[in-house]
């Protein structure tokens, strides 16, 4: 019997169905579904894991934060321990009757490690088991049949690269998190997370916030006019200078506007709008962010679509379709859907289909593309939105460029030159079917040199330069990729970790005071941790392991030596770290200024000595007894925002498994419904601060 191991139970069921023609027999082994099938002449058992079934950890003697010096963890032994004991038991039991293991996990660094670990567990029961590899990029009949027809060797170097990543992240994360948390007395549920990838990522967000805070707006002035032709057509023009940095210059130009204008020249250009490139993981996250999806939500939904056989593997860097994909057949398959029939027809009527190409080309997986035509009714609302985005992107990569005509007319008004710009799409092509791309036509009438125009209005606007925008999750993932922070499989989880730790909130992302303090400390005393350079270097070393150029032991030892250098500096400034972080944590607990008359106190999160319930109270207690009730579950974060209905402070609640939500602390806020006012919130003064 052959033992086939997949990464998830849903994938196991699908693979079993494809290989057996839906002739699988399901049995539960220690509560784990195992699918027994016949594939050709071979009897097989197919079992699905839950991702990693083993984790790395230090021996138990290192578990006490208060008794173990964090530095001692750097050279400590690392163990592998079970995460899902029932799956480990089931794997061993089934392996006892197996003659061969076939690894059918996702083909990437993490998938190879998951498969390797499962093989090692199976070997504990049956030491004679050899392992082979089934490589595929889609859970479709053709891909699975092809993969099992030409099994390959397990890529041990790729698995060892994944193990190196586990070891390094454990060492760096445990040592730095324990040291910073203990130094600032932020332990147990209040610990301060620091990590090899998350800290430089957090630094990007904090640096942008500091840049915004230090931004000094520069005033400028814009002069516009409104014109009318003798045919009654109205349009607008802006002074050629666009921005006047001196008000007197803008006023001078403005004062010359009177009477009529004369067209000096008209220039027309036609530019080509290239179709979008095929989706890889990063570009999918960026595009999905524009329709309201977080990075984690995008990957989770994409993973589900992949597991159900609707799209190809969603973790890929590739942006070039390989020749092995029959693009035309996929379009024909999609044409049966009313939602995409029009776009499919436009693709198929071309004499030759020439797909667009991105800059990145890899051989492990193709770009993300649809593998099955599924109806809207079979998917949830969010699943359909992402599936539709992927399908439309795929179809648009197969369509010709669009064409946009731009018109620029220079107009003389009192010796000052104004420019009227117009543009309109003259050939839609892919633009017609990709409604995520927005182009607003700007109308100006047909003009000729020497034509006289009546001035019907004028304006001089006071404006100022804007600070750089905060990172959205999509843009942050893009920046992380650019700097070599994390991988396509881990970037979204890094962002989620920063959110769950209370370091960042919202989208665009805003750092907490605690986050700003941690980053400032790291930049001041351990710049290697906050810089992307060290992390990027280690990522390249792990790629070297995958290529066979370096060993896991060499790279892990190199990272240990790096960390030892960092810890020498940090231990010398432990007292400074303690003071700076304690101050920042205190700032994070300030909800806002007290609203009571003649009180200068701050509203802070407190805990009742009697009920042990948390509430918001004034730090001027007992002089001021103002209080507000709070939800008792979830992490509370300050937002610095004021309620638009009552001007009271707004807080953000983060609860595991729920979308973060904002709450006005005022129980009598006119923006809250009566049910909430009566049952969920108390008036100021109702919660004792004893």
Please place each PLM-identified region on the residue numbering.
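C-terminal or mid-to-C-terminal helical accessory/interaction module adjacent to the motor/catalytic core
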Residues: 83, 96-97, 139-224, 268-272
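Phosphate-interacting basic helix/loop segments used at nucleotide- and nucleic-acid interfaces
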Residues: 76-101, 204-205, 286-287, 388-395, ...
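Basic, low-complexity terminal or inter-domain segments flanking catalytic cores
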Residues: 2-3, 35, 121, 177, ...
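Structured, non-catalytic alpha/beta "coupling" segments that mediate domain-domain communication
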Residues: 29-59, 199-245, 396-443, 617
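N-terminal cationic and glycine-rich segments that engage phosphates or anionic surfaces
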Residues: 280
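Metal- or metallocofactor-binding catalytic centers and their adjacent structured scaffolds
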Residues: 244-277, 285, 451
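Intrinsically disordered, low-complexity regulatory segments
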Residues: 1-166, 170-174
């Amino acid at each position: 019997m052959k033992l086939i191991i997949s990464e998830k139970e849903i994938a196991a069921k699908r693979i079993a169905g494809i290989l057996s023609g839906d002739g699988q027999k399901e049995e539960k082994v220690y509560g784990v579904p195992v699918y027994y099938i016949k594939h050709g002449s071979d009897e097989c058992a197919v079992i699905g894991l839950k991702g990693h079934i083993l984790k790395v950890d230090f021996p138990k003697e290192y578990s006490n934060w208060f008794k173990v010096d964090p530095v001692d963890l750097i050279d400590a032994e690392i163990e592998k321990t079970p995460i899902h004991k029932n799956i480990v038991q089931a794997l061993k039991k089934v392996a006892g009757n197996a003659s061969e293991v076939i690894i059918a996990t996702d083909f990437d660094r993490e998938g190879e490690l998951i498969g390797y670990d499962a093989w090692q567990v199976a070997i504990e029961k049956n030491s004679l088991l050899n392992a082979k590899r089934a490589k595929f990029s889609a859970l479709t009949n053709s891909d699975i049949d092809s993969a099992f027809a030409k099994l390959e060797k397990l890529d041990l170097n790729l698995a060892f690269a994944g193990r190196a990543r586990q070891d390094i992240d454990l060492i760096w994360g445990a040592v730095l998190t324990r040291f910073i948390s203990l130094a600032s007395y932020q332990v147990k549920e209040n610990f301060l997370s620091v990590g090899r990838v998350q800290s430089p990522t957090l630094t990007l967000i904090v640096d942008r916030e500091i840049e915004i805070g230090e931004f000094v707006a520069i005033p400028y002035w814009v002069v516009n006019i409104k014109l009318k032709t003798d045919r009654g057509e109205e349009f607008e023009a802006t002074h050629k200078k666009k921005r006047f940095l001196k008000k007197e210059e803008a006023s001078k130009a403005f004062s010359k506007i009177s009477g009529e204008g004369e067209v000096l020249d008209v220039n027309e250009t036609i530019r080509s709008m290239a179709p979008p490139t095929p989706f890889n993981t990063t570009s999918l996250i960026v595009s999905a962010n524009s329709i309201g999806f977080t990075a984690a939500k995008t990957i989770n939904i994409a993973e589900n679509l992949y597991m159900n056989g609707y799209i190809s593997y969603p973790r890929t860097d590739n942006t070039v379709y390989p020749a092995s994909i029959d693009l035309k057949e996929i379009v024909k398959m999609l044409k049966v859907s009313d939602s995409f029939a029009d776009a499919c027809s436009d693709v198929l009527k071309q004499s030759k289909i020439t797909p667009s190409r991105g800059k990145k080309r890899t051989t492990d997986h193709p770009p993300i593309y649809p593998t099955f035509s599924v109806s809207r009714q079979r998917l949830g609302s969010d699943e359909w939105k992402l599936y539709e985005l992927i399908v439309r992107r795929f179809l648009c990569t197969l369509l010709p460029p669009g064409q946009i005509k731009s018109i620029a007319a220079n107009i003389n008004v009192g010796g000052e030159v104004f420019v009227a710009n117009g543009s309109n799409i003259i050939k839609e092509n892919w633009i017609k079917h990709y409604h995520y791309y927005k182009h607003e036509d700007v109308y100006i009438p047909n003009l000729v040199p020497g034509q006289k125009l009546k001035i019907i209005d004028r304006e001089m606007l006071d404006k100022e330069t804007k600070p750089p925008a905060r990172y959205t999750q999509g843009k942050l993932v893009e920046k992380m990729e650019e700097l070599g922070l994390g991988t396509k499989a881990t970037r979204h989880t890094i962002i989620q970790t920063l959110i769950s730790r209370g370091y960042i909130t919202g989208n665009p992302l805003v750092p907490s005071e605690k986050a700003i303090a941690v980053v400032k400390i790291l930049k001041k005393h351990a710049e290697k941790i906050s810089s992307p350079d060290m992390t990027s270097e280690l990522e390249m070393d792990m790629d070297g392991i995958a290529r066979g150029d370096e060993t896991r032991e060499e790279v892990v030892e190199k990272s240990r030596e790096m960390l030892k250098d960092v810890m020498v500096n940090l231990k010398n400034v432990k007292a400074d770290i303690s003071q700076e972080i304690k101050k920042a944590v205190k700032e994070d607990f300030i909800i806002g200024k007290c609203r009571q008359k003649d009180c200068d106190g701050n509203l802070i999160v407190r805990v009742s000595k009697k009920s042990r319930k948390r509430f918001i109270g004034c730090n001027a207690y007992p002089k001021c007894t103002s209080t507000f009730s709070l939800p008792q579950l979830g992490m509370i974060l300050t937002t610095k925002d004021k309620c638009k209905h009552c001007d009271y402070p707004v807080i953000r609640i983060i609860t595991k498994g729920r979308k973060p939500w904002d709450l006005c602390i005022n129980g009598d806020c006119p923006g809250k419904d009566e049910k909430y006012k009566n049952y969920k919130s108390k008036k100021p003064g109702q919660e004792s601060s004893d």
